[in-house]
């Protein structure tokens, strides 16, 4: 038998074996939910109500596989609150906060989309990229730190949690230059830029150094408290059981902190499951005196997190 033929047979056997293995896993993963799981689903759906039904459908889906893509539609850049802006794509958002000391970015998007998405989006909102003083990265993946080096080279500081600085430095070489190690975020130690203090909360699971942020925002004469959970798991199949358990603990820890700090504005860096597009549309049509759709209220925010925690627990139970 010729060597090429033998290699071809081995390759076919590997493909068939791999396909069979994935088929078996899929069949196992789609087995009917147990009575216990159905009970938790019903409880979580009740927590979701109508306002967080999108969150429930996304996270409690059987075999969720929808992740963000770099070619998802670009959103119309928007001023969400008096000092809070959003730029990016429907699945990967960059948030800009104006302070008395300059602009702070939460994440910096894809590195190869600076000139096509982030910078023109900022300019459309009247935000000068040269005034970016800090970039705070929610977690150490390239769709979040991609543009950070650009701003760092122009004088901005870059903030990442310690474990994710390690992750960034170990990232394989590619076309996107990562930022150089700079400020290390620490749980509960505020990062104050001008008149705004950002409180980091460690939420490991998606990455070892995933981080949430709590900070004040302006809503007319009212000060609101915004929260961004910077390490959402979109496709739980990528995590081990221990990783899922750690993530659930992180969501619950985040819930405790945000309840104590009275977070009432909900935003995400992967806004695929929180009515983001609906809220942007309502914001665009909002008339003077009408409530801001991003101000969800403290109780509603906790229900949102209850759905995240409940659905992730469901996904873990489905593996048993």
Regions found by a protein language model. Give the residues of each.
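Active-site environment of divalent metal-dependent phosphoester hydrolases
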Residues: 113, 140-146, 166-168, 208-211, ...
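Active-site HxH/HxHxD metal-binding segment of metal-dependent hydrolases
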Residues: 31-42, 46-48, 112-116, 120-190, ...
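Active-site neighborhood of phospho(di)ester-bond hydrolases with catalytic His/Asp-centered motifs
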Residues: 106-108, 133-141, 159-161, 203-205, ...
